[in-house]
Amino acid sequence: MCSIHLPDIVFQLDIPQIMPVMSALVLSILLGLAAVWTHADLMCKLLDEFQRIVLAVVTRVVIPILPFFIATTFCGLAYEGTITRQLPVFLAVVLIVIVGHYIWLAILYGIAGAYSGENPLRVLRQYGPAYLTAVGTMSSAATLAVALQGANRAAPPLRRDMVSFGIPLFANIHLCGSVLTEVFFVMTIGQMINGSMPELSTMILFCLLLGVFAIGAPGVPGGTVMASLGLITGVLGFGDTATALVLTVFALQDSFGTACNITGDGALALMLTGYADRHGIEESDEHRQLFNTEDEKKIGFAK
């Protein structure tokens, strides 16, 4: 049986990275901490401006050309027959990941219920609309209003001040479903492309760094995997083909990953409420200052 090879590349433009991923990560963390420690207002403003510049480049340049990159890579894989051989594996992986989401949510709500002393199902059953909205939008930011409404319907046991503080915060920094999915996918694709999974030490480093990167990832479709592309290529050493596979397979289940993120926020809000009750923190009325318009009725804070 003869093997199929792609024609030679006519033109290729290699753009090397400015610095290694680890150097960029350590520099960003130390620079941010030092700016806070020294109260360097000018540097903080510069970093904020730089963040907006980077986000503008990502949204206006990287994301628009990303579908073409994935499409051309998959054309090559289809020409070689790789897609046909691996399609059942992809579908099985997506189903396993979705089941993993439910298992993790059960664990998370179980821990929240044990810590707070409340029935976590009273919170979980209010997250049906938010879960479906997240499946449809694939965006934590777009689902925030529905998540606030569901969390407010769960008060009690949730406290409204904890809801108004915690839910918007967790929607941006708590991406448990996306992180769980990405870790599973990189191991699977590493096995498929390279013939072996990444080493344990490499995966531990990747998971630790991914947790940091996920906190700063935007709550938009594909935000987590886009923010961690440097880790995928730098730490795991994935090439163009493996990276394109990660992006594509991640997009197949991004709806359910986002839904897991949003639904898990309710468990964290329950933990936050339990912490406030255990430490005698009185309930604040400041949430009324945040939702004192007519929109309050739409998100459930007004009766």
Positions of PLM-derived features:
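Signature of multi-pass transmembrane helix bundles
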Residues: 1-124, 282-290, 296, 300
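Juxtamembrane helix-boundary/capping and inter-helix hinge elements in multi-pass membrane proteins
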Residues: 36-41, 49, 80, 116-121, ...
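Hydrophobic alpha-helical segments of integral membrane proteins
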Residues: 43-61, 87-90, 94, 120-131, ...
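Small-residue-enriched core segments of transmembrane alpha-helices in multipass membrane transport
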Residues: 51-54, 90-107, 124-134, 203-217, ...
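Hydrophobic transmembrane alpha-helical segments of multi-pass transport and channel proteins
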Residues: 98-103, 134-139, 172-180, 211-223, ...
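Helix-loop-helix junctions within the multi-pass membrane cores of secondary transporters/permeases
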Residues: 133-214, 282-287, 291
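Interfacial segments of multi-pass membrane proteins
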Residues: 190-194, 229-239
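Cytosolic juxtamembrane C-terminal amphipathic helix followed by a basic/polar low-complexity tail immediately after
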Residues: 262-303
